[in-house]
């Protein structure tokens, strides 16, 4: 339970401060634990980042499926509506996972955590659409919204929603 609380605090700290800026001492303060406790659960700054990303991953998947309608077009539309809400509330600067990879491009553990997260999101969208053959195109729309959000905002979501509808209706 304490590990999860620390991971939740790390997620908030990295989301607000980025990955390069906060020192381990600042992260310790943000988590309201001793340095020993922090290192017991996350023995390096990279492990802290991975812990925060894994915590956020599960929170994100749960968030996408919250009050989800029946699978199919309605469910995918719901996912994109939830994506917009997530970006507005929790990720105004875009995808935290991609920001972590950009900050640590050569770190194998961070790269692996991000890759697993993205693959699970791709599979979820395919499953919810009832069109697993369209998992990758739908995922690319999802990622496009995340990337374009800081510049286009709601326009990115609206455009993706139009493409989702066309893609799912035209390929039936």
Task: List the predicted regions and their residue ranges.
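Amphipathic alpha-helical segments used for helix-helix packing
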Residues: 87-111
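Helix-turn-helix
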Residues: 5, 9-47
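Hydrophobic alpha-helical connector segments
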Residues: 51, 65-90
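A general structural signal for well-ordered alpha-helical segments in protein cores
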Residues: 45, 76, 80, 94-98, ...
